[in-house]
Amino acid sequence: MKLAFSVRMIPLLGFVLGGACQPGAPTGDRPDGVTVLVGTRPTVAEASLFPFDNHSIPFTQNVGLKLHPPRKHPGNPVLPRGPEGAPDEFGVQFYGSVVRHEGKFKLWYVAIGRDPFTVVEEDMMWTPRVDIIPLKWRAAYAESTDGIHWTRPALGLEEYDGSRDNNLVLMEPAPLGVINLKVIHDPEDPDPSRRFKMSLHTWWHEEGKKGLATLAPAVSGDGLRWRLAIPATPENGLLPKESTVIPTDHFEAAGGLYKWGGLFHASGQGARPVYAVDSWGRSVGTYRSPDFVRWEHTGTLSFSREGQHKKVPSGSGEESHEGISVWNRGNVLLGLYGVWHGSPDWRGRTVDLGFVVSNDGVHFREPLTDFIFIRRGEDHEWDQGGLIQGQGFENVGEETYIWYGAWDPGSLEPRGGVGLATLERDRLGSFSVRDDSIPAAFMTAAVEARGEATLWVNAEGVSEDATLRLELYDALERPLAGYSGEGAALLTESGLRVPVSWPEGNGIPGPEKPFKIKVSFEGEKVAGIRVYALYVGT
């Protein structure tokens, strides 16, 4: 049986006009009135409740949160630059995506050919200041059976340097220059020829003159042969200004792409005052579309760092680089963004990767402020200077894979590649006891299951001397008979996915009423327990 359930935020994420409403009360018990539907409550087959998501787990006692950075793979970069004459000989820029589909890991990235810049002027900050040649920056494809060893298939679709023996994907109606792209697979689209979707950071032109960064949406049936989703014909790799789908302000539009609440969201980098509340320097904005063709021109300031509300010279402060790449976990969005460390000189600027989370698909937050989740490499390493957040996240067996890229090294030298970072499955963050001499516990937001539910725990350090007591409460935090007190479940073993057994059975039966989960840390060796996730599903 497939279970559908949703995570409710209690108190409700909304405001009821015209009468009081008890949190968690059935809809039929509510008086007449108006409910403002702020936020989303997606119904999914299995929900993941993480310690760093303080909306899904808002209540704690004597527990501390820790984030766990992944380990870089010793064979990095797992996808290096191509050989001389290849369309990616200058750079493999993983402003791209990895999608697991039909038994393969499929990777899209920006291939940078030789001589991709023109020098505009000598400049103290840029040394020298350059402009991008759009047709030297193209969308390319690689694939793998294990996510570590990659091949570049000869697709024969696009010509480069007089040959079609390359891995460039087809982009119609004409080649389009891209500096950033993201790809998702959308199996819900009734049209099979549109089930792969790509957001492209390109540029518009006006009367042949290159303008500002903008968004171009593209669709494909196989992920290799793409067509623009809008009626537009690029010229010299640029989109006509009249064909733009979002406001023509500079917006680097392909930092992340995801579908949430029935809408497609394009996350990107902006640096101009286009939102009601703005920040200084690079910040994260989001635009939305119901069909991937018509994009709403009202946007959102989705994320900026705490220090960005103080004015500093452009590029010199702490900023948020290139949008948020998103791992859609069904009931919550996890993401990476560029932690920009500014400098008056371009060569002094560096970028690490930070970790964020969202429960509404619009606003993101850092569980720990300015925490560096993946750190740039040391001098002379392949990923020195800075990292870029490709949208590549997968659970593979007992590990979590996160793919990332190397940024501009601060010069006009060849750059890039795709790296892999790994950690134990879903162990991105944990709760542990702060003081083992006093009680420690946490409680989730309300979960509403339609049908019998099962609970699993991802934890380590659990034993007969270090246990987790799990109890269920209703939405008003009254203990549920048979699932609390003497009916509580006691977890005595560690693992990535340990099922919870209640005295009355493994399952949590209906009726379809919201319940909360309380987890208490107990035992002489309680200090060694780490809780990484709860899973509710079938």
Model region roles, listed by residue range:
Residues 8-19:
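Bacterial N-terminal signal peptides
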